[in-house]
Amino acid sequence: MPRTSPDSVLFTTYNTLNLFQEDTPPERDRYQLVVDTIRGLDTDVLAVQEIRAPDERTAQQRLRQLAGDAGLRCTVPRPEGDDQPALAMGPHGYHCGLLWREGIEPLPCSLRCHGTGYFWHSLVSVALDVGGAQVRHAAHHATPFGRRMRADQNELLVGLVTRPPGVLPTLVGADWNTTCADRVRDEATGKWVLYESADPFAGAEWSSSMIFHCEWDYDEAGQRRHRADLEAGDVLWSGGLYDAAAALRAPWHPTFGHSPADPGAARAGWWRIDGIRVTRPVLGALRAHHVEDTALARRASDHLPVTVEYAPAALARE
């Protein structure tokens, strides 16, 4: 992704698909594909989902390994003891982490981790000094199950990253596991319309797994009618956590569905569930949005990396 300015920052989110889950030759080869994909992005800050590990010590070691192999850093200074990897443990074995390039400095004691008791997976965030501006970056993985739980946990997420008033400008890279419900103003009519107007489930034959992502009712003949559930996405937008793709009016591009072996791909076809959301002070600083849709990225994971570019000098203060 070419930069629009030498002073801009690139922030990427990447679901790495069960990384480290199996120590087998095929998975070791795929790990290298993930590393090659990350290196090819040449990003400044990276949010990763699906670091697999049975315990915190192993998870931290694996995040350190990924950072080292990708040429990035991942530890935050503490007043006492060793620096701490920017990793939040998820209660179901899927963990989130943050990595950043040399030259970007984490603010001491700024690491925030939320997992068990907060989310189905987890949320990790760190305040980073990106060339004189202090900006909080976060990695999150939303629940794959429970539409109402997803909406409730999104409400909690909004509270954690937007409160109290005066918090640092924040960007959250995530596998949101939901359809975007952000609205944009139609220049012709002045109306607020859905940025993502096409329903990813439209035309798909009903399957039982759609209960996790769809609303449904029945017509007069008793035939089931289904549509994407937008509540969880609307909680984010209405709560002040904005989809960067929508804010930039970026061309729609899916991030999930290219892997024919994944049952989710058959369920929804192509779907845009990975993305970066930002608080209001970041909106005016956004410059570009990009989905890394390459043969390498498609082989490395069932999700495609998403990158946004922002200009620290253009960040607003609330």
Language-model features: locations:
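Membrane-interface helix-coil boundary segments and nearby low-complexity
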Residues: 1-13, 17, 315-318
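Structured beta-strand-rich core segments of catalytic domains in phosphoester-bond hydrolases
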Residues: 27, 51-138
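Metal-dependent phosphoester/phosphodiester hydrolase catalytic core
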Residues: 131-135, 140-150, 182
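Metal-dependent phosphoesterases centered on the DNase I-like endonuclease/exonuclease/phosphatase
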Residues: 155-269, 273, 280
